[in-house]
Amino acid sequence: AGGWVAVVVILVICLIGLLVSSVFGIFFSGEDSGNGMTMQTVVQEINTEYDSRLDEIKNENAYDVLEMSGSRAVWKEVLAVYSVKTTTDQDNPQEVATMDDNKKQLLTDIFWEMNEISSRTESKTETVITETDDGHGNIVQTETTQTRTYLYITVSHKTAEEMADQYGFDDEQRQMLSELLADENNSLWSQVLYGISVG
């Protein structure tokens, strides 16, 4: 009986090893592998870099009105693309359960390939009507023109599907991507990104 237990234990260890080294290893990436880096800390750093780029644009331009539009890619999609691309790389396949400087750079590059920030300024001359009292109880309307500078910041993003096209993913890689992004994995994504275990 003891022999069977050993076989079962070995099989379980092998299965866990296979899972961790597959695209699903991303769901184990919340732990520090000894270098102080986790998926959460790297995502926070990239988010900070993203916010800094937005602030940079605001600080570099003199403006009266700020108009922001668009949205960035959902982190779950960025990480799914990273996981498939990294584990199935023909030249240098790597597991994604751990994080290091090299993988951090890969993830950062994918994030910026999926997210683009563009900006422009435009001067507009607008008519402003001000109402004043003439001192005798009469309202006097005065029209003046003002030139105001508008700063437009647009964030555009690519979906996981668009990145699969860009990277030339084959059918098997697209299937992996689809499985990672399935709704039943949402609680696993929450755990990876926020350390939150749901349900």
Sequence positions of predicted segments:
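Membrane-proximal envelope biogenesis segments
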Residues: A1-V198
